């Protein structure tokens, strides 16, 4: 039987990220099409080579075709039929999808139905799925949802204290995101500790950021809510605020509610306080960004304390992942120091270079603390393989 390659696709409103794997789950190539609809930029990495070029992408369709042509042009594949499986990251599956799913007429219709819950994400994701269904007719397509891991959150944790019809008629509730990352971290540590199920507090800290309480291997609670805007202070997102601010600013500045929410998503967070959304720049200049760093660290620490309480103080590890959690040692140290009274201990000597994971807690620490490099693309590959194999059976 011919061994098929597996493509992982992450489509956004103005960008598409790709990773191509062989049947041994090894990365063959990484691609990026960004600034779609504007001026266009393309990047491809393979065999220790890197191609970067400006390309006009008028829509997602042209971006997909350019990437697939680049794979053939650079002899990464000979024919498109070599790609037998495509895993699509889909942000919003609501509480309907409790697992990854083979894309068919029904599942695609549901993804489109949930565009109203995540218009910036589900629409381009649905569009790109349809493009691949046409471009590579022989491939199976699997949708892997950010929200799936959080469908185990109990009702008392996902329900908002709002009128009942908001949930019943408009699907307003906590969904949570970064689920693929949390699933990867949980499974990685199950293997590392040779123990399952685990209790974990995982901080996924990147430009977007959230915290998740995992109880017995399942999501118990998470800081992001109905949208990724809730929770931690992020690169450009405000995180938790008083909701009455939205109508107040709309009235005061003669803006629509959508305009205000757009500013909370794209012009707030660390960007609003420091003028930069790049966490590396911010934490490299602590003397200039002192207030912003304190706000950021305090918010993460508050969620760690909250979730430790919800887990009755019984956890196998506190985990830091995502671009900031994996690499910004100064930031992680500050957060751990902020929760030292709860029994978490570290020191700067433990923050060296590492590959997949690194223990950063001291012997005196009540709890283990790890940094773990997440791999959402590999998790999507594994979910896609599992779902497509089950279909064959």
From Swiss-Prot:
Subcellular location: Cytoplasm
UniProt name for this protein: Acetate kinase
Lineage, opening ranks: Bacteria, Bacillati, Mycoplasmatota, Mycoplasmoidales, Mycoplasmoidaceae
Pathway this chain belongs to: Metabolic intermediate biosynthesis; acetyl-CoA biosynthesis; acetyl-CoA from acetate: step 1/2
UniProt cofactor note: Mg(2+). Can also accept Mn(2+).
Binding of substrate, residues: 89
Self-association state and partner proteins as the record states: Homodimer.
Keyword DNA damage set for record: no
Residues that coordinate or bind ATP: 17, 204-208, 278-280, 323-327
GO MF terms, alphabetically ordered: acetate kinase activity; ATP binding; magnesium ion binding
Keyword Transferase: yes
EC number(s) per entry: 2.7.2.1
EC top class, as a word: transferase
Cofactor annotation: Mg(2+); Mn(2+)
Residues involved in Mg(2+) binding: 10, 376
The entry's keywords: ATP-binding, Cytoplasm, Kinase, Magnesium, Metal-binding, Nucleotide-binding, Transferase
Reactions the enzyme catalyzes: acetate + ATP = acetyl phosphate + ADP
GO cellular component entries: cytoplasm
Sequence similarity: Belongs to the acetokinase family.
GO biological process, one term: acetyl-CoA biosynthetic process
Chain segments annotated as transmembrane: none
Chief location: cytoplasm
Transition state stabilizer, annotated site positions: 178, 237
